[in-house]
C-alpha cells in the first residue's frame, strides 16, 4: 500500500477534514510539479519586511566582514576562460545578515565599461589592498608546488591570451562611494604545468601570453548613431545610486531579485533635466516611480532593481525594471544617452541571468518598450519611447541592437570596441611591463585565513600552472585557506574544507573574498541569544552553510566552547537547545550583569527620587559600551542596542534619583530611539539649524555626512572631481563651538564641518569712473535677500524663471504656470522684486520669479491638529499643496465629497485656512471652507476595561504608545505591520478607542483602534477572466465532478464550474470565504483558548502551548493543525496518539517510555500502528508535545509550504488553471471551508489572513 503522506496537503485536508471529497487523478503527478505559486512573495506579507531587508543585504553586502578583502586584479593579468568553462550562476543568492557587517567595511569593485566580462552594478575601482599576514610556523612542504620539475614552455599558451576584460563581481556594494585609484596593469605570464601537491617549489622563467581573438559583432540594423558610438568607443559612466528610503519595496511576481526584463521609457518632457525628473518623482512617488534615469552624461539608479517599481501599469510593474531616458537636444548628447541606456540595460540583463530578447513584435521577451507593454499586456496606454527616438532619426530596433551588442561584449562573446578582431597578437601602443622579461618566479607560503569563492570565477586549478580552471559549484561558501602561491603576477589561494581539511584546489586571488583568521581557541562561556538567530557550520558562514536556527521564545542560553577571530570580528562555536554551530559575537549578549555606569556621589547623601523632565536641544553619540536603551527611565535595565557610534538628536533630558537620562531620536525623522544614561553618551549642545545661501570651495575626497557631527557610520558620500569643488550651502547648525553646513557638491548632498570649507576669493573689480552723461537711478528697495514665508501661484503668462536675479534673460517658465509653490526668499534687484520658489516639499529651490508674474499671499506657520471633518458636497478637491491649483489636485471634489477627512495639521494662506490630512487613503490639503467640523463633544475618558481579542496591525505608518494619547512616547509600527496584536485591555479617550496588548516581539503597548483590523484581506489580480478559467476547468480530460443526487457523481458543466470559482460570490459568504484563509500563516490564538477547545480531547488536552509553538516555528495555521490532529487521532484517543514502543519489531503499549504520533505520519496502511510508532521513535517523540511540534515541521515542509496555501488555490490553482489541482469535486473547497469555520467558531476566534484571487 502507498504511504498516506505521499499525498500533498490538500489531499490530506480532504482526508482529514472531510474524507469524502474526490481527489484528483493528477495527485501523483503533482509530486514532481514545480512550485507554481506566482504571487508567493507578495502573499507572504507578514514576513515581507524581513524578506526585503534580508534581500537587500543579499545584494548589497556579499560578506559579513570584508575589511581585509583583496580587490580584483587588473584586466591584463586575468587568465582567459574557455567557452565551456562554466563558472557558476551569475545570480547572487547569498544571504547575509547586515548586522554582522563590520562598520569599516568597504567593498571595492571594478568599474563597468564596454569591455567587461560579467559584471556587477557597483562601479568603483581601487588599488589592491595587500594582506601579507603570513607565517611559516608549522609549515609543511608536503602539499607545495613541485620545485624540482623541468622548466617546460607550454606551446598551447602561445595560441591564446587573456581577454582584455576583468572578471568582476556579481555583488552590489552598499558601501559609500569614495575617491578611487586605478590599479597598475601588469602582463600575464604563461607558465609550465606541474603536478599540484608535490614537494617544493623553484622559480621558473616563462613567456608572455598574447591576446585572444574574438569575432566582431555584426550589426543587425544600419545605424549612423550606433556607428558613431562604436567609432568613438564611448564609455558608460558609473552608475550612481540615489535611493529614497520611503519608496515602497515589494517583490516581483517571481520573488525578490527576480525581474523578467527591462522596459524602455522616455520622460516626454523636452525641458526637464535628470535632476529635475528625479526631484519630481520623489515628490510624487505615490503616482509613479522608476528604477533609473539616463541622460547623455549620467546613469542614476533611483530604486533598488531587486524590487518592483510603479512605472508601467499593474500588469508590467510586478515583472520589469523600468528605466527613463531623459531628453537631450544635440547629436552627441543623444548618442551618449543611447550608449548609456544600452550599457545599463545590458548590465541588468547580465546581472539577473537574462538574455536579450525583444518583445516588440510578439509580446514575449526581456526587452520591452512602454508601447509593447500597452499593446500586449495592458494596464497602461503609453506609447513611448518611439516618438522621442524618431525625433533624433533613431529607432527602438537600433537601440535593441546596441543593447544586444553590449550584452555580448560583457559576456565575452564578441570583441570589445577599440580592439582588433584577429588571430595576430595586438601590440600595445605603450609597453605595460619593463623591457626586461618577467622571471615568473613561484613562491609558496603557509596561510591561516578563510575565503569565499565568488559566483563569477575562473574555476578551481589543480596546479597554479594550469591554463584554465575547472568549473566549481562550491561558490559562496566559507573555506579555510592553508597556502598562498604567487606565480609571476598571479596570486592563488589553496582552499580546503574548514571542518574536514579536504582540499578543493587553488583559486585566483581575484576570485575570492579573503579574510585573515587567527587560530581557534577553547572557551567556556555562556551567552544569551535571540530566537531565530542563524547558526552556521563554519565561522563567517554563508546561507549555504546554515546549521540551523535558534528555537524557543524569549532569549535562549548559548554555551560557547570555541572562539575564532576572522579579520576584526569574533565568532563563537557552541550549543543552544540541542543545536550546535558558529555565530557572530555581535548576536550574543554576555549573561553576566553589565557593570552599571558609576554615578558621582554627591557631597551629601540624597534620597530624592523625584522625576524631572525638561526639553533639550542637543546631539549625542552612544558609546560602544553602554547600558542599553530604556523605554522609560523607570526601567531597571536597558535593552541592548546596535545604534552605537552614531549621532542622534536629543530632545529631552530626565533626572530620576541619582541618574540622568537623554531621550535620543533620529536626526532626520521623528523616530524615537529611546532613553540613554548620561554616562553612556558623548553629548554636545546644539543650536537650531538656520537657512543660509553661501558658496564655498571644498577639496576632493572630503566626506559628507547625513547628519551634522556625523560618524563614519553616517557618511553620505565623498566629494568627487579634481581640484577644489564648489559647495553650495543651504543650512547651518552650530554643535558646541563648531559650525556644520548642509549643502550640495557635484550632485551629492550632506553635512560637512566648516573647517573643511573655504570662502572663494572674490574677483577683483575694476573701479568704474563716473560718467556724467548717465544719471544714476535711486534704489528704493533693500538690495539684500530677505527670508520670507509666503506662497505663490505662477500666472499662465509669465516672463520665465531665473537661476539668479542677476540673469538678464529668463528660461521658459511654462511648466510652472498655473501651479502653487512655496516662497522662501525675496530680493529686490534694480526696480524689480524677485522671489525664490521652492517645490511642494519645501526643500528644493526651483528658481527666481518676478513678483509681477505671481499671485502671492502670506503663509503662516503649520500648526498640529487632530480633528475629523466631513467634506462638503461642493468642494475643490484634495491638493498636493495648500491653495493648490487644478493642476495639483490629487483627488477631485467628486471623489472626496461627504467623506471623512482626518486632519493632522493646518496652515493659514492669506485669510484662508488649509488643513492637511488623509481621506480615501490619500494625503493632501483641503480648504477649511470645504469642510464641516463635527459637533463638539466634551472630552471624556473611560476607565480601561479587560478585553481579550487578537487583531492584525494594518497601518505600518501608525505608532504604538507607552501611554494612550501621548505625543512624545510613540514608536513606529512599520516593523509590526500585518502582524498580530493580542489585546488585553480597551479604553476610550475623547472618542478614540485604544487597545492595550502584546506585540509580536512580546512588548506591551497601546495602539489606536484605527490602526488595527479584525482580519487582513489581500486581493490578487489573476490577469484572466472568470469565463476564461472556468472554460479551462470545464474542458479538462478528467472532468470536475458534482453530486446533483447524494452519493452519485456526475460531470460538472461550465455553469457549475463558474459558480464554484466565482471569488466575488464566495468572499461575501461568511463561511465559504474561509477557503481563502491562508494555511501558512499562524495568527497567535491564545494558548488558553486552544486549551479550552481541546478539553476532553484525550492526550491532546492541555496541549495548547505545543500547538502554539508549532504554528509559530513552522508557519502553519493553528486551526488547521488542530483539526488535522483531532481527525487523525480520533479526538486524541487513538493508540498511535496515546503512545507505545516497538521492541523486537512488536508494539508494546505498557512500556515505561512511549512514543507518540498525532498526525499519522508514516502510518502505512498495512500496519499503521507499528509503522507510525517506529517513525515516532526514530524522531524521538517521547512526549505528546514533541509529536505535535515535530509533526508540524514535517507537515509544513512537505505540504503547506508547497505553494498553494489556501483551499481555493488547492482546488482551482488560479495561477495555472487546470494543473496541479488536488480534487475534482467542485464543492471540495466549500465543504472544507465550512469545517474550518466551524472550528474557529468553537474556539471563539475568526480567521485573520485571507488571500482572494480576482478575475477580470
Swiss-Prot record:
GO biological-process terms attached to the record: cell wall organization; peptidoglycan catabolic process
Compartments, record wording: Secreted
PROSITE patterns for this protein: GW (PS51780)
UniProt region (Endo-beta-N-acetylglucosaminidase), positions on chain: 776-1256
Catalysis performed (reactions): Hydrolyzes the link between N-acetylmuramoyl residues and L-amino acid residues in certain cell-wall glycopeptides; an N(4)-(oligosaccharide-(1->3)-[oligosaccharide-(1->6)]-beta-D-Man-(1->4)-beta-D-GlcNAc-(1->4)-alpha-D-GlcNAc)-L-asparaginyl-[protein] + H2O = an oligosaccharide-(1->3)-[oligosaccharide-(1->6)]-beta-D-Man-(1->4)-D-GlcNAc + N(4)-(N-acetyl-beta-D-glucosaminyl)-L-asparaginyl-[protein]
Disulfides per UniProt: none
The GW domain, residue ranges: 443-517, 519-593, 612-686, 688-762, 784-859, 861-936, 943-1017
Post-translational modification: Undergoes proteolytic processing to generate the two extracellular lytic enzymes, probably at the septal region on the cell surface.
UniProt GO MF annotations: amidase activity; mannosyl-glycoprotein endo-beta-N-acetylglucosaminidase activity; N-acetylmuramoyl-L-alanine amidase activity
Region annotation N-acetylmuramoyl-L-alanine amidase: where it falls in the sequence: 199-775
Signal peptide (from-to): 1-29
Domain of life from the UniProt record: Bacteria
Region annotation Disordered: where it falls in the sequence: 103-151, 172-219, 419-440
GO cellular component, as recorded: extracellular region
Pfam families for this protein: Amidase_2, Glucosaminidase, GW
EC number: 3.5.1.28, 3.2.1.96
Subunit structure: Oligomer; forms a ring structure at the cell surface which is important for efficient partitioning of daughter cells after cell division.
Notes on the domains: The GW domains are responsible for directing the proteins to the septal region.
Family: In the N-terminal section; belongs to the N-acetylmuramoyl-L-alanine amidase 2 family.
Function in brief: Endohydrolysis of the di-N-acetylchitobiosyl unit in high-mannose glycopeptides and glycoproteins containing the -[(Man)5(GlcNAc)2]-Asn structure. One N-acetyl-D-glucosamine residue remains attached to the protein; the rest of the oligosaccharide is released intact. Cleaves the peptidoglycan connecting the daughter cells at the end of the cell division cycle, resulting in the separation of the two newly divided cells. Acts as an autolysin in penicillin-induced lysis.
Name this protein carries in UniProt: Bifunctional autolysin
Gene name as annotated: atl
Amino acid at each position: 500500500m502507498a504511504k498516506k503522506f505521499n499525498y500533498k496537503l490538500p489531499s490530506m485536508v480532504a482526508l482529514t477534514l472531510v474524507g469524502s471529497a474526490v481527489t484528483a487523478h493528477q495527485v501523483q503527478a503533482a509530486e514532481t510539479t514545480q512550485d507554481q505559486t506566482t504571487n508567493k512573495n507578495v502573499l507572504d506579507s507578514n514576513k515581507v519586511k524581513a524578506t526585503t531587508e534580508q534581500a537587500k543585504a543579499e545584494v548589497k553586502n556579499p560578506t559579513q566582514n570584508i575589511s581585509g578583502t583583496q580587490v580584483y586584479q587588473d584586466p591584463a593579468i586575468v587568465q582567459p576562460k574557455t567557452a565551456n568553462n562554466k563558472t557558476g550562476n551569475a545570480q547572487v543568492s547569498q544571504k547575509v545578515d547586515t548586522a554582522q557587517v563590520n562598520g569599516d567595511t568597504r567593498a571595492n569593485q571594478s568599474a563597468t565599461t564596454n569591455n567587461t566580462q560579467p559584471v556587477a552594478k557597483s562601479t568603483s575601482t581601487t588599488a589592491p589592498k595587500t594582506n601579507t599576514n603570513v607565517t611559516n610556523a608549522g609549515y609543511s612542504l608536503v602539499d607545495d608546488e613541485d620545485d624540482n620539475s623541468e622548466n617546460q614552455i607550454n606551446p598551447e599558451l602561445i595560441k591564446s591570451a587573456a581577454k582584455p576584460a576583468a572578471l568582476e563581481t556579481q555583488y552590489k556594494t552598499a558601501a559609500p562611494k569614495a575617491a578611487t585609484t586605478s590599479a597598475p596593469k601588469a602582463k600575464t605570464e604563461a607558465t609550465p604545468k606541474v603536478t599540484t601537491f608535490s614537494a617544493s617549489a623553484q622559480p621558473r622563467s616563462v613567456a608572455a601570453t598574447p591576446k585572444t581573438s574574438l569575432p566582431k559583432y555584426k550589426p543587425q540594423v544600419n545605424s549612423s548613431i550606433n556607428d558613431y558610438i562604436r567609432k568613438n568607443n564611448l564609455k558608460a559612466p558609473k552608475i550612481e545610486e540615489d535611493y529614497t528610503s520611503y519608496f515602497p519595496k515589494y517583490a516581483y511576481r517571481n520573488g525578490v531579485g527576480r525581474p523578467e526584463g527591462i522596459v524602455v521609457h522616455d520622460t516626454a518632457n523636452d525641458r526637464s533635466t535628470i535632476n529635475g525628473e528625479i526631484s519630481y518623482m520623489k515628490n510624487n512617488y505615490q503616482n509613479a516611480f522608476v528604477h533609473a534615469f539616463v541622460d547623455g552624461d549620467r546613469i542614476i539608479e533611483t530604486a533598488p532593481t531587486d524590487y518592483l517599481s510603479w512605472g508601467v501599469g499593474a500588469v508590467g510593474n510586478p515583472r520589469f525594471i523600468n528605466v527613463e531616458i531623459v531628453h537631450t537636444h544635440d547629436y552627441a548628447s543623444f548618442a551618449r544617452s543611447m550608449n548609456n541606456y544600452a550599457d545599463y540595460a545590458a548590465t541588468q540583463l547580465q546581472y539577473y541571468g537574462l538574455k536579450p530578447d525583444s518583445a516588440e513584435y510578439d509580446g514575449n521577451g526581456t526587452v520591452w518598450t512602454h508601447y509593447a507593454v500597452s499593446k500586449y499586456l495592458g494596464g497602461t496606454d503609453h506609447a513611448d519611447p518611439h516618438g522621442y527616438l524618431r525625433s533624433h532619426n533613431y529607432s527602438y530596433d537600433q537601440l535593441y541592437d546596441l543593447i544586444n551588442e553590449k550584452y555580448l561584449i560583457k559576456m565575452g562573446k564578441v570583441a570589445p570596441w577599440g580592439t582588433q578582431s584577429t588571430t595576430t597578437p595586438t601590440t600595445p601602443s605603450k609597453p605595460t611591463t619593463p623591457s626586461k622579461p618577467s622571471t615568473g618566479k613561484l613562491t609558496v607560503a603557509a596561510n591561516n585565513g578563510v575565503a569565499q569563492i565568488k559566483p563569477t570565477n575562473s574555476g578551481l586549478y589543480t596546479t597554479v600552472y594550469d591554463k584554465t580552471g575547472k568549473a566549481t559549484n562550491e561558490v559562496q561558501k566559507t573555506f579555510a585557506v592553508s597556502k598562498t602561491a604567487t606565480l609571476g603576477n598571479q596570486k592563488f589561494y589553496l582552499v580546503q574544507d574548514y571542518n574536514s581539511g579536504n582540499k578543493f584546489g587553488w583559486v585566483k586571488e581575484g576570485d575570492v573574498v579573503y579574510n585573515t583568521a587567527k587560530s581557534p581557541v577553547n572557551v567556556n562561556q555562556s551567552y544569551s541569544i535571540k530566537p531565530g538567530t542563524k547558526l552556521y557550520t563554519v565561522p563567517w558562514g554563508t546561507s549555504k552553510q546554515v546549521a540551523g536556527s535558534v528555537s524557543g521564545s524569549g532569549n535562549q542560553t548559548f554555551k560557547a566552547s570555541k572562539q575564532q577571530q576572522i579579520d576584526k570580528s569574533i565568532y563563537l562555536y557552541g550549543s543552544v537547545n540541542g543545536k550546535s554551530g558558529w555565530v557572530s559575537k555581535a548576536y550574543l549578549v554576555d549573561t553576566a550583569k553589565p557593570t552599571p555606569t558609576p554615578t558621582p556621589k554627591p557631597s551629601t547623601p540624597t534620597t530624592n527620587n523625584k522625576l524631572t523632565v525638561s526639553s533639550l536641544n542637543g546631539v549625542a553619540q552612544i558609546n560602544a559600551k553602554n547600558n542599553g536603551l530604556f523605554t522609560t527611565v523607570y526601567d531597571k535595565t536597558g535593552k541592548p542596542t546596535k545604534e552605537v557610534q552614531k549621532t542622534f538628536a536629543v530632545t529631552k533630558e530626565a533626572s530620576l534619583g541619582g541618574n540622568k537620562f537623554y531621550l535620543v531620536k533620529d536626526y532626520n525623522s521623528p523616530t524615537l530611539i529611546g532613553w540613554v544614561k548620561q554616562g553612556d553618551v558623548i553629548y554636545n549642545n546644539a543650536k537650531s539649524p538656520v537657512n543660509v545661501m553661501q558658496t564655498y570651495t571644498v577639496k576632493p575626497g572630503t566626506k559628507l555626512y547625513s547628519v551634522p557631527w556625523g560618524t563614519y557610520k553616517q557618511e553620505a558620500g565623498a566629494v568627487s572631481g579634481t581640484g577644489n569643488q564648489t559647495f553650495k550651502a543651504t543650512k547651518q547648525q552650530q554643535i558646541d563651538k563648531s559650525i556644520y553646513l548642509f549643502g550640495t557638491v557635484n550632485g551629492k548632498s550632506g553635512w560637512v564641518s566648516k573647517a573643511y570649507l573655504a570662502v572663494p576669493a572674490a574677483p577683483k573689480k575694476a573701479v568704474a569712473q563716473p560718467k556724467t552723461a548717465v544719471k544714476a537711478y535711486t534704489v528704493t528697495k533693500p538690495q539684500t535677500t530677505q527670508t520670507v514665508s509666503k506662497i505663490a501661484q505662477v500666472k499662465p503668462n509669465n516672463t520665465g524663471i531665473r537661476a539668479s536675479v542677476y540673469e538678464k534673460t529668463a528660461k521658459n517658465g511654462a511648466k510652472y504656470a498655473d501651479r502653487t509653490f512655496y516662497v522662501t526668499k525675496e530680493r529686490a534687484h534694480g526696480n524689480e522684486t524677485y522671489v525664490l520658489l521652492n517645490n511642494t516639499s519645501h526643500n528644493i529651490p526651483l528658481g527666481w520669479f518676478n513678483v509681477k508674474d505671481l499671485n502671492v499671499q502670506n503663509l503662516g506657520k503649520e500648526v498640529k491638529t487632530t480633528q475629523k471633518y466631513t467634506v462638503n458636497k461642493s468642494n475643490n478637491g484634495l491638493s498636493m499643496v495648500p491653495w493648490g491649483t487644478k493642476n495639483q489636485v490629487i483627488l477631485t471634489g467628486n471623489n472626496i465629497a461627504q467623506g471623512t477627512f482626518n486632519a493632522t495639521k493646518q496652515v493659514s494662506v492669506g485669510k484662508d485656512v488649509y488643513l492637511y490630512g488623509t481621506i480615501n487613503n490619500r494625503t493632501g490639503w483641503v480648504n477649511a471652507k470645504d469642510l464641516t467640523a463635527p459637533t463638539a463633544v466634551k472630552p471624556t475618558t473611560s476607565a480601561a476595561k479587560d478585553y481579550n481579542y487578537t487583531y492584525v496591525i494594518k497601518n505600518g505608518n501608525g505608532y504604538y504608545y507607552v501611554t494612550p494619547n501621548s505625543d512624545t512616547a510613540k514608536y513606529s509600527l512599520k516593523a509590526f505591520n500585518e502582524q498580530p496584536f493580542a489585546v488585553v485591555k480597551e479604553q476610550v479617550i475623547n472618542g478614540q478607542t485604544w487597545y492595550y496588548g502584546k506585540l509580536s516581539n512580546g512588548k506591551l503597548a497601546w495602539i489606536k483602534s484605527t490602526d488595527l483590523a479584525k482580519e487582513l484581506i489581500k486581493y490578487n489580480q489573476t490577469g484572466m477572466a472568470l469565463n476564461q478559467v472556468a472554460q479551462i476547468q470545464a474542458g479538462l480530460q478528467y472532468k470536475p465532478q458534482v453530486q446533483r443526487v447524494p452519493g452519485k457523481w456526475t460531470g460538472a458543466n461550465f455553469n457549475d464550474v463558474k459558480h464554484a470559482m466565482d471569488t466575488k460570490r464566495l468572499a461575501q459568504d461568511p463561511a465559504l470565504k474561509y477557503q481563502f484563509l491562508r494555511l501558512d500563516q499562524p495568527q497567535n490564538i491564545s494558548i488558553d483558548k486552544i486549551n479550552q477547545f481541546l478539553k476532553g480531547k484525550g492526550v491532546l488536552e492541555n496541549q495548547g502551548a505545543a500547538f502554539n509553538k508549532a504554528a509559530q516555528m513552522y508557519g502553519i495555521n493553528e486551526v488547521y493543525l488542530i483539526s488535522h490532529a483531532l481527525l487523525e487521532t480520533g479526538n486524541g484517543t487513538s493508540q498511535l496518539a496515546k503512545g507505545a514502543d516497538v521492541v523486537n519489531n512488536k508494539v508494546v503499549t505498557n512500556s515505561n517510555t512511549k512514543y507518540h504520533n498525532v498526525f499519522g505520519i508514516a502510518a502505512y496502511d498495512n500496519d499503521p500502528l507499528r509503522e507510525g510508532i517506529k517513525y515516532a521513535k526514530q524522531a524521538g517523540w517521547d512526549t505528546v508535545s514533541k509529536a505535535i511540534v515535530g509533526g508540524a515541521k514535517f507537515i509544513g515542509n512537505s505540504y503547506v509550504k508547497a505553494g498553494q496555501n489556501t483551499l481555493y488555490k488547492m482546488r482551482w490553482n488560479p495561477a495555472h488553471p487546470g494543473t496541479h489541482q488536488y480534487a475534482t469535486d467542485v464543492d471540495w473547497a466549500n465543504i472544507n471551508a465550512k469545517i474550518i469555520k466551524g472550528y474557529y467558531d468553537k474556539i471563539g476566534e475568526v480567521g485573520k489572513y485571507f488571500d482572494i484571487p480576482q478575475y477580470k
